[in-house]
Amino acid sequence: MIENHVGCYETGSLDFFGPLCVVACYVDQKDEKELNELELDKEMSTNDIEKIGKILKDKLTYSLLLLDNSHYNQYVKEGQKLSCIKAKLYNQAMINVIQRIEHPISKVTIDAFLAPKKYYRYLKNKIVVVRHIEFKEEMSLAMKCARILSQYAYLQYYQNMCQSLNTTLPRGFNILANDTGTFLVHEYGKDILYKVSKTNFPNYKQILERVK
């Protein structure tokens, strides 16, 4: 049987277009059987993510922090690295969840995107820092739920972006992202990239070179 625990995960850090979505969520022992029946380990389609995301959203205590592109790029402009931005969002999302849980929490788990020393170094100026975190390669049940919830939030935002721009934005950061970015600059001007993409990705400079 699992312990009562909190897990944290993010979606968006590997996508040139779209926000950064960090979710922390709490999983109770009594939820284990029902959550395992959802087969959270399987490869999921967009429909699967939307269907299961809605179930988890209604069932679990969680915190979503969504950093849109304009705010993300402002942090980058100030000299913050992606890993630093993620560490701060993870810490705040976990604080939000832990403050809402009345039961004892046995452990807190996150993906090992940073060495623990570096993670805590990024948080040295924060007044409240969640400590005694397990940095895991293998995901806990709460991390699996947080992953789905972050994907669900990202998809909702992403679909709205595609609709408002009247184009399909590619996921990832390959040549298709450059082609779409070039199209958007021709349609809306260079400033559009600051609003819809991550300017610290190589794609950003490559697109600006194309449209000179």
Q: Locations of the language-model features?
A:
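RNase H-like, Mg2+-dependent phosphodiesterase core
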Residues: M1-K212
